[in-house]
């Protein structure tokens, strides 16, 4: 079996200087790395007046994300400014006591019992989409990334707000998110470099972000108002409102803060999953042996029935495909933190205010930690294989700030791949050229058309 090597940005033969880095990063933050970046443990660069450090070994990543987490807890000020118009002080960008309180309130919503409850909505939404595909007929061209985005948005909307409210409002909210994402894309370089907010170009983009964020706020506020009228028991918004009640009867969060957390859940719950699923179908389409093994597993475990939550533990190869997809295409390819106080790592002084980057794109393709790191080999994640060294695989981040929705995302993705792959094959047209786009998340660039084949 010859493993597929998906295309990736050209790597520079030697380290590029700060001005070259700026040039390449204008359009793609993943095109600025040289070959040595996939071999080295710790790197530093001074870009303009900003000190930038890259933690690129398991021990340093552990130090930054766990052992000295309090010093590297905070997102960069510029990243906060980019996301605050949308998320306010939501879980994704808060820190300190605010973050700890929000995390504590929401953690029970993502325990196994709740995920199993949500899985019924997840499964029915996937089946509904698959039925719509079936009705289109064999050899229909499916724009896969758009379809996966719609699916993930429907799932999180229905899980958050209930079947009726979610179905009626997901499209409007997703459209508003797309507008916001286009602004964030323009801000990616300034966020990464920590350019000051007073710079005209940066300031103008922050203004655009605020206007786009307000559109989303209005849409979500309207949905919450309807949800509060009752009849939405078992939804995430209902669980969040209940969890917000303290024993003394005093609300732990304001209405505005609840809205912020709902937006965080919606944003994190549809964007990353949609991207992972789109990349998964692309990789499967280029790997006939992988597809054959996937179909064999689905036939053996499911025998044509719709997968349920209890099946997930037996869909080991399906899960391995997703794990390998997230290794090659990490949902969030660059994690940025700010050093609050001066520090020292491996003899290098880390000035207060420096950017400390943990880059899943690098560590998950690092030549010290992965054999054939650029190859698509799901078998490396199968039971019995050597497990990846801790802190070399970070699709959901790591440490105390590991993604709260990790189990939800895995459940959703496994059920989606199992349900869809049982009924369809997706073929990439010969003329199609697949490229990536690095925003806050890593997604296919432009459209991803695939030919839908109904399995007999």
Listing of model-derived features with the role each one plays in the protein:
Residues 30, 37, 126, 130, ...:
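Cytochrome P450 proximal C-terminal region
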Residues 1-52, 59, 63, 69, ...:
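N-terminal targeting/anchor module and adjacent flexible "hinge" preceding the catalytic domain
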Residues 58-59, 361:
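Alpha-helix/helix-capping structural signal
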Residues 19-41, 218, 222, 305-346:
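Conserved cytochrome P450 K-helix E-x-x-R motif and the immediately C-terminal K′/meander segment
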Residues 358-386:
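Conserved cytochrome P450 K-helix/beta-meander segment immediately N-terminal to the heme-binding cysteine loop
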Residues 2-10, 32, 72-80, 98, ...:
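Cytochrome P450 heme-thiolate monooxygenase catalytic core
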């Amino acid at each position: 079996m010859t493993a597929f090597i998906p295309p990736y940005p050209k790597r520079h033969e030697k380290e590029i200087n700060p001005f070259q880095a700026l040039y390449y990063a204008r359009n793609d933050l993943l095109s600025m790395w040289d070959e040595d970046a996939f071999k080295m443990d710790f790197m530093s660069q001074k870009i303009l007046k900003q000190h930038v450090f890259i933690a690129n070994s398991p021990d340093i990543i552990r130090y930054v994300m766990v052992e000295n987490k309090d010093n590297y807890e905070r997102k960069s000020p510029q990243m906060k400014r980019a996301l605050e118009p949308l998320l306010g002080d939501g879980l994704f960008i808060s820190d300190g006591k605010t973050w700890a309180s929000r995390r504590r309130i929401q953690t029970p919503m993502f325990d196994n019992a709740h995920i199993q409850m949500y899985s019924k909505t997840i499964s029915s939404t996937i089946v509904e989409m698959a039925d719509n595909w079936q009705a289109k007929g064999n050899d229909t061209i499916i724009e896969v990334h758009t379809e996966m985005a719609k699916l993930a948005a429907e799932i999180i909307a229905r899980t958050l707000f209930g079947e009726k409210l979610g179905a009626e409002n997901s499209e409007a909210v997703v459209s508003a998110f797309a507008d916001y994402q286009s602004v964030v894309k323009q801000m990616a370089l300034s966020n990464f470099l920590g350019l000051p907010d007073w710079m005209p170009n940066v300031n103008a983009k922050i203004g655009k972000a605020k206007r786009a964020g307000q559109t989303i706020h209005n849409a979500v506020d309207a949905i919450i108002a309807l949800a509060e009228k009752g009849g939405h028991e078992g939804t995430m918004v209902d669980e969040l409102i209940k969890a917000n009640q303290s024993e003394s009867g005093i609300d732990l969060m304001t209405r505005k803060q609840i809205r912020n957390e709902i937006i965080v859940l919606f944003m994190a719950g549809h964007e990353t999953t949609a991207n992972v699923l789109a990349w998964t179908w692309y990789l499967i389409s280029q790997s006939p042996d992988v597809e054959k093994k996937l179909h064999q597993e689905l036939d053996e475990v499911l025998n044509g029935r719709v997968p349920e939550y209890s099946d997930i533990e037996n869909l080991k190869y399906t899960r391995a495909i997703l794990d390998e997809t997230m290794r090659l295409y990490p949902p969030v390819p660059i994690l940025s933190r700010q050093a609050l106080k001066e520090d020292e790592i491996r003899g290098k002084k880390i000035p207060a205010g420096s950017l400390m980057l943990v880059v899943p794109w690098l560590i998950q393709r690092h030549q010290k930690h992965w054999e054939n790191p650029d190859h698509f080999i799901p078998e490396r994640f199968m039971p019995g294989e050597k497990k990846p060294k801790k802190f070399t695989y970070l699709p959901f981040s790591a440490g105390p700030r590991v993604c709260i929705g990790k189990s939800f995302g895995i459940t959703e993705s496994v059920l989606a791949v199992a349900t869809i792959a049982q009924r369809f094959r997706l073929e990439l047209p010969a003329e199609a050229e697949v490229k990536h786009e690095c925003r806050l998340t890593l997604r296919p660039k432009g459209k991803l058309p695939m030919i839908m084949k109904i399995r007999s």
